[in-house]
Amino acid sequence: MTGVRAGVREGVLGPSYFYHRGLIKRSKGWSASEIREYQDTRFQRLIRRYGDQITQNEDYRQHLDRYTRWDVPLLTRTVRTGGTSGQPMRFTADSFARRQKERAYLFDIWSQAGYAPYDLRVRYCGDIPGGLIHYNRLENVWMVSPGATVERELGELRRWLRTLPPFFLHVYPSSLYTFIDLVGEDLFRRLPVRGVIAASEMFPAGDQVQFEQEFGIKIAHWYGHSEYAILAYCCRQCRGFHFYPTYGHVELLSSEVEGCQRVIGSSFNRMGTQFVRYDTEDLAVDPTGSCANDHFPRVNAIVGRSQETFVDNAGRRRSLFGYAFGDLDVDAFWDQIRDLQFVQDKPGFLLLRVVPNPGAEKDQIRKAFERRFPMAKLEVEYVSAIERSPSGKRRYFVDRLPTDATESNNHPQDSHPDAAHENGPL
């Protein structure tokens, strides 16, 4: 019966899903020259239409109409997001084909951990309605709200987890060990976790391999953007990142950081906003050697997308990105915010610095974030601008805690100035 239900679900994935699934399969056998030919045709079409200048977040804020095609009611919709770097923005996306395309690529990545379409997932990231746990029947996913995992709810969470059949755990890299800490390592080892699906923050060097060896659980991991311009999977063979050539076009340009290149992306979507030579503000480590998996464009690592965690009022480390942004991109909330930054200088306390847009409802902003951070005292400060780091990159999190601020965290965490956004709300 389960197989029948899965077959029905896969049957409604849509024509774009099956088109891209076939394209992905074929592209893995392409030579480097075949990949260049496929990409150059589409990339040059964008250059002829929009020019060859490097674009920034602000270009799409100020001139969205210029970069948007076929903005037809019902066929397209407005996407509001915290943005790849935490700077809120909005753009237009295809209402149907985009989501089908996303599923094709993400399901391909998730298959590295053994996932098949509509296998059971437990998703520990983002905001959810209705308290601690919510089931999405269409996606076959149990969603656990990070904001509801306060100390008094942990007993219920642990009891519920013991009742589950085998499942895939869907997390941010920074929330994986938080989840283990919340449920307890002994219980986690007994849970029927088939694999881990880790969204597009970066694991600190060696962490992914260490987890897989320690727990005997495979991780599917990727690098992507909420702007849907480029997408790369983490290769289990070389541990680098391979960019899907049929998803979008990636350029690696020189930077001021030795051994690193700027990541520039261009999207291949036909409807909605087209991102052209878009500066992701991420850096990539130059590839070394070769990988026999495929001839996709490849980098050794992504720089500037490391985990960021805050310490709550119980001394636990939690993923800041999952709590701060999560699924807030589903409505007009981000239209009120131009920029924001979190600062922590003592456990259990967060300062939120907000650059509001004209007409912003400040009380709504404060209440929205207070609801997401019940395990910390939140102070909101409205400012005219967020300063950048000496290197010129904006920082959405400033961690001023001493390294020994918490004893309950049994896994080392890094504090870096940048974070990633997961591709889509699947």
Q: PLM features: what roles do these ranges have?
A:
Residues 120-122, 264:
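Conserved beta-strand elements of the Class I
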Residues 169, 271-272, 276-374:
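AMP-binding/adenylate-forming catalytic core of the ANL superfamily
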Residues 256-257, 314, 391:
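Residue-level recognition of short loop/turn positions
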Residues 203-290, 306-307:
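Conserved AMP-binding/adenylate-forming
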Residues 50, 81, 121, 169, ...:
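Residue-level signal for inorganic ion chemistry
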Residues 1-80, 86-119, 127, 163, ...:
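Nucleotide 5′-phosphate-binding alpha/beta core
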Residues 126-244:
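Conserved adenylate-forming
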